[in-house]
């Protein structure tokens, strides 16, 4: 019983330490971290379970590292003039001296952990445009219109969004995997001229107690500093799932911070759009779901969109397909997602490679030169043993520069269709439809 009390005491003190750490009372936080380490060490001494020992050791190392970081920061601060720790502009001394400070000096005054978080979040800003245009997204016409309404129009025509007409602040894209939710986000990043943050759960969740909610707060602070920002959160259910008795304190704190920031309590959230994607919308916390004013179902593509997807994925790869072939493939792939069609085409594109690999006979043909299509040159290509021009050989006998690979045919696609199956079943789709009827709207 004694060792349990030691551990409970250590946890109690380290929670106080993280609270002081969050409040930027670093001296008190350092003292409490050191005190908690003494209790953790004592608990470790009396712990009999090897598994529990390993957990305690890992936590002890984490809090020791944080204590050392704080000590290093406090030692440096002793040699500097008083400043607002973390750049708090409301501090009178910080305001008096802040006017002439450079960005470099601000970085030096910032707590090392705050600076580290800032740098980490800065890497999530999309600086290179993904080069995905609206037209590159097959189908999803309604979803694209909603996103233009929420993102493009408020930036291009700000005079239209005054008074009671406000742009949407939260949009949730949900649907089966591989239907284009993240691809739509790339199109938004390409089309807008404002700052685009692309966040995944790994950018937010850290091993440090109290650090994750700090990252959430800092993310929104950075977004407010930039004029007109979009925060895209992929797999948002990993961060904001329904609350239950089994979830950790850290997960609960992350959700609470998201709710505070998305609600704009005590902060101006104008000019920030939170765009999120999830495959399991029913798993989201109810309060988080309410923050997303628009909940758009990104369902499976319709036949016209599927035909366009086949064309996009095949692209410039040599092929013999015509419009009727694309329509036939679209009709045969009912229930396939965009990702499934991508996998199917990828397999079909490999069929000519397999034909070369398995061929026992090749023939000589005349075809436009790769270097200069206006010039005809001799190549060899696989053929059936019964072809009048067939010569018995394998791919090992061929000069690589003389090989002419077969073009992709409708037969290749049909062959791959027998192998590549859809990844979503009817039961899954029924659940999405039920959620859409209750809480969302169709984006197709």
UniProtKB/Swiss-Prot annotation:
Residues 2-80 form the MIT domain. Pfam families: AAA, AAA_lid_3, MIT, Vps4_C. The gene is vps4. It comes from Dictyostelium discoideum. Gene3D superfamilies: 1.10.8.60, P-loop containing nucleotide triphosphate hydrolases, Phosphotransferase system, lactose/cellobiose-type IIA subunit. One of its GO terms (cellular component) is endosome. This is Vacuolar protein sorting-associated protein 4. It is a peripheral membrane protein. Belongs to the AAA ATPase family. It catalyses: ATP + H2O = ADP + phosphate + H(+). SUPFAM superfamilies: MIT domain, P-loop containing nucleoside triphosphate hydrolases. Its main location: membrane. Signal peptide: none annotated. Involved in intracellular protein transport probably out of a prevacuolar endosomal compartment. May be involved in the release of components of the bilayered coat from the endosomal membrane. The association with ESCRT-III complex mediates the ATP-dependent disassembly of the ESCRT-III complex. It is an enzyme of class 3 (hydrolase). It is found in: Prevacuolar compartment membrane; Endosome membrane. ATP binds at residues 175-182. The lineage of its organism: Eukaryota, Amoebozoa, Evosea, Eumycetozoa, Dictyostelia. Residues 86-101 have a biased composition (Low complexity). The MIT domain may serve as an adapter for the ESCRT-III complex. One of its GO terms (molecular function) is ATP hydrolysis activity.
């Amino acid at each position: 019983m004694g060792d349990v009390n030691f551990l409970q005491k250590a946890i109690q003190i380290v929670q106080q330490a993280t609270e002081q750490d969050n409040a930027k009372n670093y001296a008190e936080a350092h003292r409490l971290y050191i005190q908690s380490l003494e209790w953790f060490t004592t608990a470790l001494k009396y712990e009999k379970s090897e598994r529990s020992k390993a957990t305690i050791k890992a936590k002890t190392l984490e809090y020791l590292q944080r204590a050392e970081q704080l000590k290093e920061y406090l030692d440096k601060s002793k040699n500097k003039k008083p400043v607002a720790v973390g750049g708090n502009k409301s501090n009178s001394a910080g305001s008096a001296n802040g006017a002439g400070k450079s960005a470099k000096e601000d970085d030096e005054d910032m707590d090392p952990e705050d600076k580290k978080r800032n740098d980490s979040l800065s890497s999530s800003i999309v600086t290179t445009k993904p080069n995905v245009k609206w037209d590159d997204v097959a189908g999803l016409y309604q979803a694209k219109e909603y996103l233009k309404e929420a993102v493009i129009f408020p930036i291009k025509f700000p005079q239209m969004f005054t008074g009671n007409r406000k742009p949407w602040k939260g949009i949730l894209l949900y649907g089966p995997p591989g239907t284009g939710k993240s691809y739509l986000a790339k199109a938004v990043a390409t089309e807008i001229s404002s700052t685009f943050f692309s966040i995944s759960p790994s950018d937010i969740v850290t091993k440090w107690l109290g650090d994750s909610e700090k990252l959430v707060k800092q993310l929104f602070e950075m977004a407010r500093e930039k004029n007109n920002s979009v925060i895209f959160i992929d797999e948002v259910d990993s961060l904001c799932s329904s609350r239950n008795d089994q979830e950790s304190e850290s997960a609960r704190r992350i959700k609470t911070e998201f709710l505070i920031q998305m609600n704009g309590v005590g902060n101006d959230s104008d000019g920030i759009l939170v765009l999120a994607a999830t495959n399991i919308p029913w798993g989201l916390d109810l309060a988080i779901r309410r923050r997303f004013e628009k909940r758009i179902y990104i369902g499976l593509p319709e036949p016209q969109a599927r035909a366009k997807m086949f064309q996009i994925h095949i692209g410039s790869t040599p092929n013999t397909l015509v419009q009727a072939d694309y329509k036939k493939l679209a009709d045969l792939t009912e229930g396939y997602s965009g990702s499934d069609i991508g996998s199917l085409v990828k397999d079909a594109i490999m069929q000519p490679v397999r034909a070369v690999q398995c061929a026992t006979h090749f023939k000589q043909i005349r075809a436009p030169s790769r270097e200069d299509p206006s010039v005809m040159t001799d190549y060899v290509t696989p053929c059936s043993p019964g072809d009048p021009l067939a010569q018995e050989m394998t791919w090992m006998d061929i000069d690589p520069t003389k090989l002419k690979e077969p073009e992709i045919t409708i037969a290749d696609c049909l062959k791959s269709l027998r192998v590549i199956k859809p990844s979503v079943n009817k039961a899954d789709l029924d659940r999405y439809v039920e959620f859409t009827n209750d809480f969302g709207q169709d984006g197709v």
